[in-house]
């Protein structure tokens, strides 16, 4: 009987210690050849950066984080030897990323000597992501090594290095582009969409999104992406421009709709945008040249 009680006791202890709260993600990190005694992880929540420093003991550390479901979490390499010093600044090393999945254990293993190659386990979304990162990680490693050579010396022939780095970037983007249609029910595909946006015609980008499953499109990020697409469609060539009104320096109200039938150049800028403000003298030159020809300027 005593043996049975002891056996049951350890079963209960194992169950308690293995539990992960349904509103947190447990992150377990295993490292090799990493010289620091902590590793930093960061993520975004509510528009703010959040972070934790995970203490390492014998190459292993763990922490529970309250990151929103499917938030991208990044492991930052704070080892100064991994950074690139360039001029008066630094170029930080690439991060290792994974997704927060509530109630799950996410295990990340990496060797600093092969950074940012990593093994990521735990949760369906990270399983999907690892299928991509398993191929992309070695390319990111190669690109980083080339960048270290590119910025380390003025004596190297930089053009071949730049071309090889550019080719790797294109290969990585192609991997992401091919992953999306093959995995329409994966949150990873939704996360990858912004990265391929600039290289695709808008119609193709929109179709990639619409081909995702309803479950993925109805997530918080999916709804946000849908809203961004709807706003972009309003400003495509050939669409009726959204009306707005502004007060000019003489106190007169100017409405875009009042200028129907005219050629109108609209310049949007912010007081914080130094390059925008530097362009104003050129804008004045354009105004002096084209305003007499019927072009209306709104700045």
Features from the language model and the residues they span:
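Active-site acidic short loop of glycosyltransferases
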Residues: 185-186, 260-262, 292
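Structural microenvironment flanking redox-active thiols in thiol-disulfide oxidoreductases
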Residues: 277-299
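N-terminal targeting signals for export/organelle localization
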Residues: 91-93, 167-237
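Conserved hydrophobic/aromatic "anchor" residues
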Residues: 244, 254, 259, 268-269, ...
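N-terminal "domain-start" segment that seeds a small globular fold
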Residues: 224-256
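A non-transmembrane, solvent-exposed segment enriched in polar/low-complexity residues
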Residues: 19-167, 171
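Conserved redox-active cysteine motifs that mediate thiol-disulfide chemistry
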Residues: 260-285
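Bacterial Sec-dependent N-terminal signal peptides
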Residues: 1-30
């Amino acid at each position: 009987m005593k043996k049975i009680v002891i056996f049951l006791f350890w079963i209960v202890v194992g169950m308690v210690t293995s539990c992960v709260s349904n509103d947190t993600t447990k992150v377990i990190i295993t490292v090799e050849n990493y010289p620091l005694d902590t590793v930093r992880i960061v993520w975004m929540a509510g528009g703010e950066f959040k972070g934790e420093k995970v203490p390492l003991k014998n190459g292993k550390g763990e922490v529970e984080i309250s990151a929103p479901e499917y938030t991208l979490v990044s492991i930052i390499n704070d080892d100064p030897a991994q950074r690139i010093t360039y001029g008066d600044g630094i170029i930080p090393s690439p991060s290792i990323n994974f997704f927060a999945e509530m109630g799950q254990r996410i295990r990340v293993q990496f060797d600093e000597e092969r950074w940012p190659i990593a093994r990521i386990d735990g949760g369906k979304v990270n399983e999907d992501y690892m299928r991509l990162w398993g191929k992309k990680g070695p390319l990111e490693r190669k690109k980083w090594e080339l960048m270290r050579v590119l910025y380390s010396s003025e004596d190297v022939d930089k053009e071949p290095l730049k071309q090889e780095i550019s080719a790797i970037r294109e290969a990585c983007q192609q991997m992401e582009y091919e992953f999306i249609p093959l995995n329409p029910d994966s949150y990873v595909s939704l996360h990858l969409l912004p990265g391929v946006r600039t290289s695709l015609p808008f119609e193709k980008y929109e179709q990639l999104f619409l081909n995702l499953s309803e479950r993925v499109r109805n997530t918080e990020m999916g709804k946000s992406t849908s809203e961004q697409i709807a706003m972009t469609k309003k400003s495509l060539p050939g669409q009726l421009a959204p009306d707005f009104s502004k007060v000019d320096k003489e106190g007169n109200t100017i409405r875009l709709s009042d200028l129907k039938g005219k050629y109108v150049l609209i310049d949007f800028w912010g007081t914080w945008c130094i390059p925008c403000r530097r362009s104003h003298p050129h804008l004045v030159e354009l105004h002096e040249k084209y305003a007499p020809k019927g072009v209306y300027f709104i700045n």
